Amino acid sequence: TTSYSWVNDTPSIGLASSGNGNIESLTVSNSGNTPVVATVIVTPTFENEGIACQGDSQTFTITVNPSSQVDEVDNQVLCNGDDSDEINFTTSNTSGTTTYSWVNDTPSIGLASSGTGDIASFAAVNNSTSPVTATITVTPTYTNEGISCDGPTETFTITVNPTAQVDDPQDQIICNGETTSVEFTTQNTGGTTTYAWANDTPSIGLAD
């Protein structure tokens, strides 16, 4: 009969520091941002007729990759027609390769519905009269030693405000000495619209 004993130099991965027999299924753990490598040494013992003979040990490793991670991304608020800021994804993961895939729930803003890697600057689009907010969800994937591990997603928003609009005021004809006022209105909603004006004939009593 051959039996086996083993020792593990890194029990933090979720495997005991030593044991006998086969290593049963276990849930591994790595709370850091770099791979953790555990070295396991297994020693066989052959027993027959009450005599035990120990054999040469064999060594193997269990590498536990960290969870893939992407740093928080700042939200953006843009005007219709503005160029967005380029978005360069970053991570605290090390000793491997982290790639990024993303989906955008509102491609009408001028950004594709999905993609991979960083997001280049694009011309923001909003032809409506109220703000449009797109939510972008990023999934990081960490690859090391040929094994890829997806991590928690990160979301951020890009809000595109509409072009400011003012309704066409009616021309006025009034008598000398009379008073009048003009109230500006807009079709814009979801924000605040302010108005600046200039008058080419201040002699009528209206500032320039």
Language model features by range: what are they?
Residues 1-208:
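Extracellular low-complexity Ser/Thr/Asn/Gly-rich intrinsically disordered segments
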